[in-house]
Amino acid sequence: MIVYGHRGAKGEAPENTLPGFIHAYRHGIRHFELDVVLSKDGIPVLVHDLTVDRTTGAKGGVCNYTAAELADMDARRNTSSWPRKVGIPTLEQLLDEFDDLEHLQLEVKKDARQRLNILCNRLTEVIQRRDLYQRAAVTSSDPWFLREIRRRDKNIRTGLVAERKFPRPLNIATRLGCEYFCANWKILSRDMVDLAHRRGMHVSTWTVNRIHDMLQLEELGVDSIITDYPTSTRMFFDNRARALLQLPAREAVRGEAEMKMGSDQGFHLSPGEGPA
């Protein structure tokens, strides 16, 4: 199961910041979910909210600040302690930082149509110029935006972000031609996951922070989880995989030891005994 770092590594570092992505990257994370908003000067920047209030010491809408002004803010306000000031980066800065990311979910929040139109153009241009068709999907809970970006380039992969079971988000995703179904983990069922797969969609679920829930979702057949703690989550699944790989060897060693013990005690199979 694929592990996406939520806003970089929201539970481990300042969200949607370069140091947060770098932190997760150094621990082996190559899949990220992040949020894209348009700055005052028309540049896609990485921030979850349409305002800067929650994550910085500043106030007001992201649209009221240039990318340079956003970069100069301190985006540590809503996170655990972090030793150095970190600003709000641009999408291009993130893409320049890494050349081997495997996949990005670029989420776009509902906003004014005029701004979304501009952001749609900017994202299309970035994906085309950097050839991110296979390595990025544009996701949103706004069907209008998903239709618009697909209208600009039918090869851009899209995903519907679904928080509730109604009004039938999987049917909406199907009508939009989405390749990704990005659902709140609490609304998923095996039937829903199976149906999404039959319709050719990758099922990604958010925000999953407990191992118990991750394992249940794995049983449902989800393709990926989005978590605030990607490095510890990745460590858990890597350790489990290594343990499973070592299991046959351990069983073989134990079997050999038991056979040797039986031989030492004079135990042997008589003719006619044993497996048929």
Region spans (language model):
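Phosphate-group recognition and catalysis centered on beta-loop-alpha active-site segments
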Residues: 1-276
